[in-house]
Swiss-Prot record:
Source organism, top-level taxon: Eukaryota
EC nos: 2.3.-.-
Gene Ontology MF terms in the entry: transferase activity
Signal sequence segment: none
Pfam families the record matches: Hydrolase_4
Disulphide-bonded residues: none
Gene: ATR5
Record bears the keyword Metal-binding: no
Protein name as catalogued: Polyketide transferase ATR5
UniProt keyword annotations, A-Z: Transferase
Function: Polyketide transferase; part of the core atranone cluster (CAC) which products are predicted to catalyze most or all steps of atranone synthesis, starting from geranylgeranyl pyrophosphate (GGPP). The initial cyclization of GGPP to dolabellane is probably performed by the terpene cyclase ATR13. The Baeyer-Villiger oxidation near the end of the atranone synthesis, which converts atranones D and E to atranones F and G is predicted to be catalyzed by the monooxygenase ATR8. Of the CAC's other predicted gene products, the reducing PKS ATR6 might synthesize a polyketide chain.
InterPro entries noted in UniProt: AB_hydrolase_fold (IPR029058), Hydrolase_4 (IPR022742), Polyketide_trans_af380 (IPR051411)
Length: 297
């Protein structure tokens, strides 16, 4: 049996940044995943075990730190730009297509949470992808209206301050009260502050982003692109107990796509544990079977 390895890799983006992360080569020429994380999430958070799972089954996976986070380039730090992340997915495909373990005709966009929507946008614009798999796509960007207004006002003040040469303003993702300071509802806020600190520390996640990250999130309108995903094959995996992105809205998203497509309802699973644990492996298996049918390997 081949020894499974993990390679430290880096590649350049079209605008000149270097993104760094991990490659899990299958050891044989074949399919590959461009894996995309959720909002400000690190490569260490949740998906490394998923990459190993696919690697053991003959699928190469690429998992990198989002630009401006972790080991990847970009200033200011933790300045999240979802549109740029879509572009980075395209450059990841270009990088993977040159790797000896990857058949460039068998590269799949794979995303989780907000990364699932980013992956769908990438697939809508890049027909090099053989398929796209979206797990728990974030369809609901629910902000408290009062905090939303305050966040946008703060973002405008930050623009003036930055033009004057000052450093960027940062907001935490989860505050000491367990809430998102910008008013964005996040499933993680059900954890205690102590649990959240442990989560951020163990996953190498900075519990802050620039105020302009929230400005970009509030202006982001990805769903107009969704009809353009077709005819690329698409799979949506929806947790039945998702309290961050309503399952019925994920189903409505799925209904936009044309065949070939597949919808999987992950019973008794939530947004953050959809594909983890022993009972989560069955949904990874369904993804693998979908890939085998669509890519014919």
């Amino acid at each position: 049996m081949a020894v499974m390895t993990r390679e430290d890799v880096e590649f350049r983006t079209m605008d000149g940044l270097t993104l760094r992360g991990w490659l899990y080569p299958s050891g044989m020429r074949g399919p590959a995943l461009v894996m995309t994380q959720g909002f400000n999430a690190s490569k260490e958070y949740l998906l490394a075990d998923v990459a190993v799972w696919f690697q053991k089954r003959g699928v190469t996976s690429l998992l990198v730190d989002i630009r401006t986070t972790g080991l990847s380039d970009g200033e200011p730090r933790n300045d999240i730009d979802l549109d740029k992340q879509v572009e980075d997915c395209h450059d990841a495909v270009s990088f993977l297509s040159r790797h000896p373990s990857v058949d460039p005709e068998m590269i799949v966009y794979w995303g989780y949470s907000l990364g699932a929507v980013i992956s769908l946008c990438a697939a809508a614009l890049d027909k090099r992808a053989a398929a796209v798999i979206a797990t728990a796509p974030n369809t609901d960007f629910i902000f408290d209206p009062v905090k939303r207004a305050a966040t946008l006002s703060l973002a405008m003040r930050d623009r003036l301050s930055r033009l004057a040469g000052n450093p960027p303003l940062y907001l935490k993702i989860i505050g000491e009260d367990g809430q998102n300071p910008a008013g964005w509802y996040l499933g993680e806020e059900r954890r205690s502050p102590e649990e959240l600190d442990a989560l951020f520390n163990s996953s190498n996640i900075m519990n802050q982003v620039t105020i302009q990250s929230y400005y970009r999130l509030l202006r982001w309108q990805p769903f107009g692109l969704m009809p353009s995903v077709s005819p690329t094959p698409v799979m949506i995996v929806t947790p039945s107990d998702d309290d961050l992105s309503k399952p019925e809205n994920q189903r409505k998203l799925f209904d936009i796509f044309q065949e070939p497509k597949e919808f999987v309802l992950a019973e008794n699973k939530g947004h953050m544990n959809c594909i983890s644990g022993e009972d989560g492996e069955q949904f990874l298996q369904k993804q693998l079977e979908f890939m085998k049918r669509m890519l014919k390997f």
